[in-house]
Amino acid sequence: MDWLFFRNICLLIILMVVMEVNSEFIVEVKEFDIENGTTKWQTVRRQKREWIKFAAACREGEDNSKRNPIAKIRSDCESNQKITYRISGVGIDRPPYGVFTINPRTGEINITSVVDREITPLFLIYCRALNSRGEDLERPLELRVKVMDINDNAPVFSQSVYTASIEENSDANTLVVKLCATDADEENHLNSKIAYKIVSQEPSGAPMFILNRYTGEVCTMSSFLDREQHSMYNLVVRGSDRDGAADGLSSECDCRIKVLDVNDNFPTLEKTSYSASIEENCLSSELIRLQAIDLDEEGTDNWLAQYLILSGNDGNWFDIQTDPQTNEGILKVVKMLDYEQAPNIQLSIGVKNQADFHYSVASQFQMHPTPVRIQVVDVREGPAFHPSTMAFSVREGIKGSSLLNYVLGTYTAIDLDTGNPATDVRYIIGHDAGSWLKIDSRTGEIQFSREFDKKSKYIINGIYTAEILAIDDGSGKTATGTICIEVPDINDYCPNIFPERRTICIDSPSVLISVNEHSYGSPFTFCVVDEPPGIADMWDVRSTNATSAILTAKQVLSPGFYEIPILVKDSYNRACELAQMVQLYACDCDDNHMCLDSGAAGIYTEDITGDTYGPVTEDQAGVSNVGLGPAGIGMMVLGILLLILAPLLLLLCCCKQRQPEGLGTRFAPVPEGGEGVMQSWRIEGAHPEDRDVSNICAPMTASNTQDRMDSSEIYTNTYAAGGTVEGGVSGVELNTGMGTAVGLMAAGAAGASGAARKRSSTMGTLRDYADADINMAFLDSYFSEKAYAYADEDEGRPANDCLLIYDHEGVGSPVGSIGCCSWIVDDLDESCMETLDPKFRTLAEICLNTEIEPFPSHQACIPISTDLPLLGPNYFVNESSGLTPSEVEFQEEMAASEPVVHGDIIVTETYGNADPCVQPTTIIFDPQLAPNVVVTEAVMAPVYDIQGNICVPAELADYNNVIYAERVLASPGVPDMSNSSTTEGCMGPVMSGNILVGPEIQVMQMMSPDLPIGQTVGSTSPMTSRHRVTRYSNIHYTQQ
């Protein structure tokens, strides 16, 4: 049964094949015979979905409707059913529309319009066969219709005008330019084949260019292009299709060719010869102009001339340059001519171009010299230096004072007219940067006028340069010469040999010597200096390495000391100025190379090869032995003892207990201000002289001041940090105040009991002092007297507070008189001039018209009463503190504030007499009065302000404290002077600068009569008032 199944399948396949073969799509194409003018139909069957042949071709630009139908399609299915034929594609349902149509019943395809091949060279028509239901009975077929070309387009050039350039004298067939034209007709067809041709050439004449007919390349016809004849050519070129046939279409273009210049013309001078004249010793920037002629293009290097002096310029006197604007050569005189050497000069001038000549003519060029005659005019000449530069050198070893007046040599000028040394000439030094030279004005001998440093900045590369001027006395002409002085350099690091003394054995007399590590310029060379003569025959030195050498005796030595002079040179052949002495001690040695002589400690040798210690031999290294002498052992023991003793001494100093009280138990360092000690006064002028201090006021020195302010009042403390006290007391306190006095223990006397220590301040000295008791009886007597004096002064002052008339104001003056000036009367008293210092005594005698007797050197002693009653309820509280020097602490320096005072302030001081039997104590301060301060003094005792002498009574000579107080009497309208700034501004010494405040300060407070005992004046005191002191107030200060 299986074979039956396969049989049926095979039959079915055969049936399908038969049906496929019988269904075909037939196309009939009408072909035209153009030559015979006949047409015929050709049937084309589609086999396996492929067309056999194209449809009939159509000619562009013609009416092809007479050829319709151009094709016919037919399907073999039309015998069984009704078929509709349809077409689509370009020219049907795509632009251009409506070119082709089809008969849907018969399948004939017709063309209906004119076609353009340049627009559509080929039409693709898709054909379909449809049944009544619109279904394709056949697969769509493609029908191709080709458009035949006709010559309807002329050639077109890419440019209407072509420009090109070509160098002149170019070889033949050199490409100039390539023309390009295109044709829109069918490619590779006769209608698009273009032929090129040169129609015309301007300028006319022999044709210079050739054109390739097919490529359009324009080339040179020959090598005779000459820019100097024609610099531009204009060609008219035609391009024709159909290979240039007469029936072809054509077009034309212009071709402009520029001929480029090359250096093919030789320059020549306008004249055949030239001449000029010039005075000798003169220069000229334009002696003569030479014109060159060149036919090449102007402004280019082919035209620009280059002038050359071929001969005659042996002394380099002339130079020639080209003017680029005119192409002329300018002959210049750059070096002075000498009539005596060359009265006439014959030059030869040649010319060529800046650019190289063209290869076509380069071999033909020859430079032809043109003669130029120069005549030198003789003139009267001055001196001149020959040679213009002369070298001198300083001999080795000349330095320091030996340079002074050292003669370098002689440099003289000559007379150019005669050639002999110049006469009537003065020599002077011109440029001399260091002012080191001097010259003899007549002989020209040059010397050093001063010493100089050989490392000066004026010495460059070891040469010092200066100029010498020679001036002719007659004509005034000047000649300049240059001298170059070679100054030998100082070798700061000249090679030095280690200076130690060396020991050598007599049986092996050799020792190693080395250069120290600070020397530079290795390797070094060593040699023995034969001084004294014959020593070089006894010793030989030979280098072992870059820094060492071995010194060997040539003969047997005797025990003793030897000094051998050795000269060491570095790699630059520089050496020390003097030979170095190598000290040797020769002795007999044992087997260990130890010196048997007890005077030598041992032998110090060094291994030549391994840098070790050992016997010095040339072949091997030995063992070094170093001995230590008794002196060395003693120094070692002494050092150990000092190391042990130093901590013990330090421990004793640190553990010593401090004595609580008493001057005798304190450590008092010896003062440095005693005799024999130099003091630095830090002042200008001569040093102070040693004179009697009893009648000489010590000079004022700068001192340190500091203004301290608390929250309630302003205090001014004046510290006499620069003062010096001499006498029997050990402390002096300066107290200035009004109601309250604040002071400082300022100085200490050198003769007081107890110890004192000197301390240095900014300027001068400041001493600490020991505390001691104050003589209260003396204080009572002192202040009682001052109180009486102030009371008498107030009672005796007349009341002059009334209208006063002054003559110098004139009559009817609108300005009123000044009242309330009764206190000025005392200032007008001329008796104050009798108490002026000796330096003002002469002025006072002139004013008083009398002779003033000097004050006696001693004052009368005033007995001190110990039981004087107190006058009035005055209470004085003295607070003092004394500290040991170990407690001294210093504060940082503080800037002193300027005093400011408001209004007019009256200050009055009363001084009491002191015991004349005691030498006055001199205190040196440096007061500085505030601006706008008027100070007048009515002195009751010879105490001139606190700069002067303070006389201390004899019974107080051994006391530690002496109080010096100033007091102001209060009156209505007078502001409270407890303000310490006022005190500083108008009375008392004002110290400028800063002070180091230490523990030696003591404060003295003076109480008001209304205050109870023990109450101090402070911020809560009813007698204390606060004032701001202005700097522009007028302050009148009176002392009594």
Swiss-Prot record:
One term of GO molecular function: calcium ion binding
Please indicate the ranges of residues that lie on the Cytoplasmic side: 653-1040
Signal peptide region: 1-23
Which ranges does the record list as Extracellular topological domains? 50-631
Q: Which UniProt keywords are given for this protein, alphabetically ordered? A: Calcium, Cell adhesion, Cell junction, Cell membrane, Cleavage on pair of basic residues, Disease variant, Glycoprotein, Hypotrichosis, Membrane, Metal-binding, Repeat, Signal, Transmembrane, Transmembrane helix
Q: How does it sit in the membrane?
A: Single-pass type I membrane protein
Q: In which tissues is it expressed?
A: In scalp follicles, present in the inner root sheath (IRS) and all layers of the matrix and precortex (at protein level). Expressed in the brain, muscle, kidney, pancreas, spleen, thymus and weakly expressed in the lung, liver, heart and placenta. Highly expressed in skin, testis and prostate; less in salivary gland.
Glycosylated sites:
N110, N545
Cellular component GO terms held in the UniProt record = cornified envelope; desmosome; plasma membrane
Q: Where are the Desmoglein repeat repeats?
A: 884-909, 910-940
As annotated, the protein's associated disorder is: Hypotrichosis 6: A condition characterized by the presence of less than the normal amount of hair and abnormal hair follicles and shafts, which are thin and atrophic. The disorder affects the trunk and extremities as well as the scalp, and the eyebrows and eyelashes may also be involved, whereas beard, pubic, and axillary hairs are largely spared. In addition, patients can develop hyperkeratotic follicular papules, erythema, and pruritus in affected areas. In some patients with congenital hypotrichosis, monilethrix-like hairs showing elliptical nodes have been observed. Autoantibodies against DSG4 are found in patients with pemphigus vulgaris. Pemphigus vulgaris is a potentially lethal skin disease in which epidermal blisters occur as the result of the loss of cell-cell adhesion.
Q: What is this protein called?
A: Desmoglein-4
Q: Which organism is it from?
A: Homo sapiens (Human)
